[in-house]
Amino acid sequence: MPTYALLGATGATGSAILRCLLASPPPDLDLNILVRSKQKLLKSFPTLTTTISPRIHIIQGNSTDTIALQQCLEDASVAFMCVADNASNKGVSLTADTVTAIVTTLGMLRKLHGSAYNAPTILQLRSASLNPKLSCQVPRLVYNIVSFCLHYSHLDIVKACEHYEAAAAKGLLSYIYVDPPTIHDAFGPNRTGHKLISCKPDVCDKQETALSYADLGAGFVEIASRKEDFLNQPVGVTATGKAKETWGVLAGFLFDGAKGRARAWWEEERPMSKPQNLFLYCVMVSLAAVVLVQYTGTMNR
């Protein structure tokens, strides 16, 4: 009787995973769901209160609350880690803070269960931008733009990954990094097909530039069912059909990230006058606007 844990089920990724599990649940599955707002979850998924398969257990609490995490992770063989912050601002740490709390909680569970403790496999949403074997397929200009704009979000994820790897070395958990390309059509239910990309070869299979959240959710569920194939390594997800592309939303995230970089620069103490800093701020934001056009244009070719 497997138990899965889903951390964050009201965002686009967590919702997509939940829809997939509800549509085709593994046999005899228990599903523990940790959310900040049970009311918000049930508004999106009203049938959860009457769902028989899988068996649903909803835990309301913060992702850094070890008591809530213990309830969610108890007996879990797989945990889908979907807690993240879309804002790429200096100091963002939600993902790393959550992973720190997860590691602390697993340490508590191992102490509680002793030799009967079974280390779960954590599936962490990452990004193809952080996977050299996948990011090398992206034009360098586009890669540099994305890395610049999402710098602080990427730092948060990198720190989280360092926590995973240290915990895995101690036998507390195994991890799998799930690396999609650009993700589109948040909360859209329609799947068009996906394929997993092994990152073991020196040269990976081609990754398409656009993937729907629905197909990403299905990819997560497939990885969970094949976790032994990908333990402690990254795996790419790519589309096999035509995703509904929502470049305007992604451009907004990149633009906000560029503003976050400029804001951090503005706030640093530098031997520049305010007019000079204001000029630099305007240049950076204008550059971000120009390169976003280049980014979306390149991706649509």
Curated annotation (Swiss-Prot):
Induction: Expression is positively regulated by the dothistromin-specific transcription factor aflR. Dothistromin biosynthetic proteins are co-regulated, showing a high level of expression at ealy exponential phase with a subsequent decline in older cultures. Its EC number is 1.-.-.-. GO terms for molecular function: oxidoreductase activity, acting on the CH-NH group of donors, NAD or NADP as acceptor. The keyword Oxidoreductase applies. Glycans are attached at N62, N86, N190. InterPro entries: NAD(P)-bd_dom_sf, Polyketide_Oxido-like. It comes from the Eukaryota. Keywords: Glycoprotein, Oxidoreductase, Signal. Residues 1-23 form the signal peptide. Pathway: Mycotoxin biosynthesis. It is an enzyme of class 1 (oxidoreductase). Averufin oxidase A; part of the fragmented gene cluster that mediates the biosynthesis of dothistromin (DOTH), a polyketide toxin very similar in structure to the aflatoxin precursor, versicolorin B. The first step of the pathway is the conversion of acetate to norsolorinic acid (NOR) and requires the fatty acid synthase subunits hexA and hexB, as well as the polyketide synthase pksA. PksA combines a hexanoyl starter unit and 7 malonyl-CoA extender units to synthesize the precursor NOR. Belongs to the avfA family. This is Averufin oxidase A.
